[in-house]
Amino acid sequence: MMEVTAKLRGAAISAQKARLVADLIRGKSVAHALNILNFSNKKAAVLVKKALESAIANAEHNNSLDVDDLKVSTIYVDEGISLKRIMPRAKGRADRITKRTCHITVKVGV
């Protein structure tokens, strides 16, 4: 089975939120997965769609695979780096904010 990979690294969303969307399209055909992502109302859907479209383009141009036969064989979301930020509070105090990122990996295959 031929598999083609695409990675989106450092996506500006937490892995926990991105996994909710990734679970929706795992194992689906590429056309069905794109349809689900187009109508999903989540920020992560835009990022996952970008990675999926990249994987489709890789399969089409690098490996000459037919797009109609492709399905999402594997999709997983790993944690990326966390950016530490400071939120000023009252009386000279400060709280630490962590802006989380993630790495989205999509594999499509025949």
Curated annotation (Swiss-Prot):
Could you list this entry's UniProt keywords, alphabetically sorted. Answer: Ribonucleoprotein, Ribosomal protein, RNA-binding, rRNA-binding
Q: Name one GO biological process term.
A: translation
Under Pfam families, the record lists: Ribosomal_L22
Q: Which domain of life is it from?
A: Bacteria
Q: Which family does it belong to?
A: Belongs to the universal ribosomal protein uL22 family.
Role played:
This protein binds specifically to 23S rRNA; its binding is stimulated by other ribosomal proteins, e.g. L4, L17, and L20. It is important during the early stages of 50S assembly. It makes multiple contacts with different domains of the 23S rRNA in the assembled 50S subunit and ribosome. The globular domain of the protein is located near the polypeptide exit tunnel on the outside of the subunit, while an extended beta-hairpin is found that lines the wall of the exit tunnel in the center of the 70S ribosome.
- Recorded protein name is Large ribosomal subunit protein uL22
**Native species of this protein?**
Acinetobacter baylyi (strain ATCC 33305 / BD413 / ADP1)
